[in-house]
Structures are given as C-alpha cells and as structure tokens.
Amino acid sequence: MEHKINRREKEKDYEGKHNSLEDADQGKNCKSTLMTLNVGGYLYITQKQTLTKYPDTFLEGIVNGKILCPFDADGHYFIDRDGLLFRHVLNFLRNGELLLPEGFRENQLLAQEAEFFQLKGLAEEVKSRWEKEQLTPRETTFLEITDNHDRSQGLRIFCNAPDFISKIKSRIVLVSKSRLDGFPEEFSISSNTIQFKYFIKSENGTRLVLKEDNTFVCTLETLKFEAIMMALKCGFRLLTSLDCSKGSIVHSDALHFIK
C-alpha cells in the first residue's frame, strides 16, 4: 500500500515539475516575441512579427539586426521620433490600413514619420487622405470680437477651418485671463462671439475694457497680430486683397484666412 502511494506521489511530483518547466518555457517564448520601444520618450510594447510585417523597413531592420539602434537607460531600443504620432504608425502595422481619429490635422507630420520608418504604404495612404481633404469644400466660419454697446467696434476673423477658429478663441481668452486676477462676468463668450462690456478709444488705439475702473486687457491690434501669427504658423494664407482696403492690416476690421 505504501509503495503504491509513494509511486503516485512521485508521479504527481514529476508532473508538477514538468508543467512548471513548460510554463517557464512558454514565458520565455512569450518574452522573446515581445519588444519594447522607446519612441521620443513614449514606451510601446508590441510583437516582433508586427514590426517585421513589411520587409526592408526601418523597424524590420532593427528587429533583424540590419540597423543599429541605441538603447535607453532601461535597455529599450530608443528611436528619436515623435512618440505621440508613433501610435498611428504602430496601428498601421497592426491593421494594415490607416485609421485616424476624427479631426486629425497632422497629415504632414505623419507623412514625415512614414518616410522615416520607410513605410511606403503608410506614406501613400497619408498622401491620399490629405489630397481628399484639400478637395473637400470647407464652410467658412468666423469669430467676432465685439463691444456690447457699439457693434461697429471690434474685429471679425474669417477662416475655412472651424478648428482653427476654436484655437484663436482659446488663445484670446488665455491672453485676456493672463492680464486679470479673476475672470469677470463682463466677458461673455458664445459659439462665435467674444463680447466685452466696453471698448474705449485711446491714443494707442482701441482697447478692451472689462471693468468700470478701466482695467486694461490688451489692444485690438495685439489680438490681430496674435491671430495672424497663429494662422501663419498653422499654414494658412492671409487674403491681403480683402484685408488691406484701409491701407494696413492693423487698421482692418476683418481678417480672412484660407488654407
């Protein structure tokens, strides 16, 4: 009886060790198929087969030792590229197609990433997407900065990109907030209008006033230059033929931007 029990215990012990070895081997195999990449400070963990999906590309070259790549302090491959945009590069490798969130506006930057990683398919899809966007007519939107008591005082900004109008509106609010301790009720915002309680005229031009004690926020000229600089940085063109009727953009009551 004891002999049979001991034999069973030995068999169970052997099976347990065998299973442990199998689990350990599976764990090693799993780890060996994974890679951690540090792209511009962002860590991505993916399978090697994902990175080698397309031959003769930058990532395939790293995995197969064709391309030498530096390591970060933790021993991960370091690639000095845009860490946020790499998410879309990796999703392209996983899905075999370009899937971008609604409102994505960084086509040119993503095209540069595709070129760096030598992904011709991704580059072609980005180019195709950008060309379709250029052909799609955009509805002109506007932002009005106005005096509550005198609608003739103020500035209108017209643009064919609604998201850019939102950027300008946020920037104007930020500029105004930075010059005030609080955010007064006299400053009201709607979908397309920023309305101040009073404007005043001074030797230096029209100023935006939010309080009865004439708290200075900024001049309309300052806001015009803010809008123009933002537009140029975002790749818009200023339609000067529309805006220079008064001799100078600074004296114009409307700015028109187009892409």
Curated annotation (Swiss-Prot):
Domain spans labelled BTB: 33-134
Top-rank taxon, per record: Eukaryota
Xref: SMART domains: BTB
GO BP term, example: protein homooligomerization
Region (Disordered): 1-22
Cross-referenced SUPFAM superfamilies: POZ domain
CDD domains: BTB_POZ_KCTD4 (cd18364)
Listed name of the protein: BTB/POZ domain-containing protein KCTD4
